[in-house]
Amino acid sequence: MGLVFRTATQAAALLLSLLGWVLSCLTNYLPHWKNLNLELNEMENWTMGLWKSCVIQEEVGRQCKDFDSFLALPAELQVSRVLMSLCNGLGLLGLLASGCGLDCLRLGETQEGLKKRLLTLGGTLLWTSGVMVLVPVSWVAHKTVREFWDETMPEIVPRWEFGEALFLGWFAGFCLVLGGCVLHCAACWSPAPAASSHYAVAGPRDHQQHLELKQANPEI
């Protein structure tokens, strides 16, 4: 029963981590980290991501343009690009390592130690990638809040607001951290040995030894 529960826990944690990894990839490439609504022209909305910015107009539709230079970006977007790209790579490695370390995958009796190490490595990589999602998303959100409430800027100047990708990134980071921690704990958890079979074999053996001792010493 313990082995079945551990296998189900590993599978659920791996699926949760897979969901978090897919969402982190979407967070990386979606141009919706920041939204800008122009009060003077409500028919025009701007969005910004890590790789490009877009303008949405009712007559023309969506038009996007990639950023010309990496060095011209703000510091938070530069660091976010690097961390999000590393997150996607580490998350993929973590999924592959964890998948090879699942109990439901048979690698032979002599490979149990290898499976445990793979599961531990995969869980560590996954929760590390989750942290690498939460850091840039939270940094960009903090910078957006500071700029939004900046009293030195004139009120007529439009301000950036939270985009949908930030909320998607927070959820992705939570899934990766939780899934990675569960996989790491499942690798360290060993099911209790079956005690019933031990006593089932030891019982008749003790009874036989008692009969032999009684025959050798009738006074017992």
UniProtKB/Swiss-Prot annotation:
Bilayer topology: Multi-pass membrane protein
Major place of localization? other
- Cytoplasmic-side positions: 1-10, 103-120, 186-220
Stretches in topological domain Extracellular: 32-81, 142-164
Q: Gene3D superfamilies, from UniProt?
A: 1.20.140.150
GO BP annotations listed: calcium-independent cell-cell adhesion via plasma membrane cell-adhesion molecules
Is ATP-binding one of the keywords?
no
Entry's Gene Ontology cellular component terms:
bicellular tight junction; plasma membrane
Keywords assigned: Cell junction, Cell membrane, Membrane, Tight junction, Transmembrane, Transmembrane helix
Q: Output the InterPro entries linked to this UniProt entry.
A: Claudin, Claudin_CS, PMP22/EMP/MP20/Claudin
| Alphabetized GO MF terms | identical protein binding; structural molecule activity
Q: What does this protein do?
A: Plays a major role in tight junction-specific obliteration of the intercellular space, through calcium-independent cell-adhesion activity.
What is this protein's name? Answer: Claudin-22
Naturally occurring in which organism (per UniProt): Mus musculus (Mouse)
Query: What's the name of its gene?
Result: Cldn22
